[in-house]
Amino acid sequence: HGSSFWSDAHSYEAMADDLAKVIAAHGGQADVVGHSMGGKAAMVLALAHGAAIRRLLVGDIAPVAYQHDQSPNIKAMKSLNLSAIRNRAEADAALAQSLADESLRAFLLQSLDFKTTPISWRINLEALEGSMPGIVGWPDISGQFEGPVLFLSGGASHYVQTESRLKIRTYFP
């Protein structure tokens, strides 16, 4: 995450178009695996550029809009004084002032680049924050992907609910 170019366009359609270009540059067809935001991007890729995908695996996400909002997490990340942080423990302590969930902090801190001076975020927080409604949403897209697809989710998943399965079958019969 975060090693690719940054763009202010952070929609699933833009991500799918980027993926299609990468796949075309590497031979024209790929087996695609996507989880969470990557899963939504992979689903849009399959629907908009189906010929680019040989097989699709989507982990713990459905082609639906969700009601949660990650903006408070982004706000907490942006609030860190990165020039004063020297290591992950200090970053965690600073982030703990805004976010109590230790596992969430550990996940978010994976996106800190400790090799830069000062430490920096590998991800474009401004683009994510500005695109949040689209990120938690689902684009107005039609069509179906007829290739092989596997959706994986745990029994206690908060992201693939029973009512989501009908929507999955609509796009991925």
Language-model features: locations:
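Flexible "cap/lid" loop of the alpha/beta hydrolase fold
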Residues: M43-A48, A52-R88
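Conserved catalytic-core motifs of eukaryotic protein kinase domains, centered on the activation segment
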Residues: S3-A9, Q67-Q70, T162-E163
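Active-site loop signature of alpha/beta-hydrolase-fold enzymes
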Residues: H1, K40, V64, Y159
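Conserved alpha/beta-hydrolase catalytic His-Asp/Glu region
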Residues: H68, S83-I135, P139
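Gly/Ala-rich beta-loop-alpha elbow adjacent to hydrolase catalytic centers
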Residues: G34, G38, A42
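Conserved serine/cysteine hydrolase catalytic core
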Residues: T116-F172
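Active-site loop/oxyanion-hole signature of alpha/beta-hydrolase fold enzymes
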Residues: H1-V33
